[in-house]
Amino acid sequence: MAQTIKITQTRSSIGRLPKHKATLVGLGLRRIGHTVEREDTPAVRGMVNLVSYMVKVEE
């Protein structure tokens, strides 16, 4: 079974770069406090790194 990480949105996407908003949508995050569980892959890690100032990651 693949490793998973929990990603929680901690800051609003209002006023952010369109690319960063699209990244949040790609991760499946919709609102502040929303948490999703995703596979720990290089692609997901790259998306998390791009919006690291808006999300919290738990291993």
UniProtKB/Swiss-Prot annotation:
Entries under SUPFAM superfamilies matching the protein: Ribosomal protein L30p/L7e
GO terms classed as biological process: translation
Name of this protein: Large ribosomal subunit protein uL30
HAMAP family (alphabetical): Ribosomal_uL30_B
Gene: rpmD
Family: Belongs to the universal ribosomal protein uL30 family.
GO molecular function: structural constituent of ribosome
Quaternary structure and interacting proteins, as annotated: Part of the 50S ribosomal subunit.
Keywords: Ribonucleoprotein, Ribosomal protein
Pfam family, one: Ribosomal_L30
Species annotation: Sodalis glossinidius (strain morsitans)
One annotated Gene Ontology cellular component of this protein: cytosolic large ribosomal subunit
Gene3D superfamilies: Ribosomal protein L30, ferredoxin-like fold domain
